[in-house]
Amino acid sequence: MNDLRYPIGQFTYKRPITEEMIDTWIQEIEDLPHELTKAIKDLDQKQLDTPYRVGGWTVRQVVHHVVDSHMNSYIRFKLALTEKNPTIKPYKEEKWAELPDSKLPVDVSLVMLDSLHKRWVNLLYSLEIEDLEKTFNHPETGETKLAVAIGLYAWHGRHHTAHITSLRKRLNW
């Protein structure tokens, strides 16, 4: 593994996006709370406060970041479903990771992630084909279709889970 920042590679997807791809991605989003919980199982406080790479976030910060990011994504989906191509508000994830709540026990975020994903997955399974074409506009990255955003956030969860599992493997935890 050459680039510790991208243990599963960067987000890519095949075009056209198929119904099977959407179903797989939604399943990955549904599975994330369990997979992330499994990835940190039995880690002690010192391990949770270990960066996954030099200059990177700690395992604890990664867990809290996933929840911060997925809360933002859930809201973006709701905005896109109720408004025409809304412009969403970006946030400074690196600064959020330094806020005091990122030092809380990881269980706080794991409970939030589980509840959030129950609601989000319920919403995702309710989407019609035409809903997948709806978009939101990110001021920095432009217009994103919900179909692509589903794939992106499925990847995002696997990406950060892999930060933790690859660290565990490298350090023999």
Curated annotation (Swiss-Prot):
The keyword Metal-binding applies. It comes from the Bacteria. Binds 1 zinc ion per subunit. The keyword Metal-binding applies. Its cofactor is Zn(2+). It is found in: Cytoplasm. Its EC number is 3.-.-.-. Pfam families: DinB_2. It is an enzyme of class 3 (hydrolase). Zn(2+) binds at H65, H156, H160. GO terms for molecular function: hydrolase activity; zinc ion binding. Gene3D superfamilies: dinb family like domain (1.20.120.450). GO terms for cellular component: cytoplasm. Keywords: Cytoplasm, Hydrolase, Metal-binding, Zinc. Possible metal-dependent hydrolase. Homodimer. Belongs to the metal hydrolase YfiT family. NCBIfam families: PRK13291.1. This is Putative metal-dependent hydrolase BCG9842_B2589. It comes from Bacillus cereus (strain G9842).
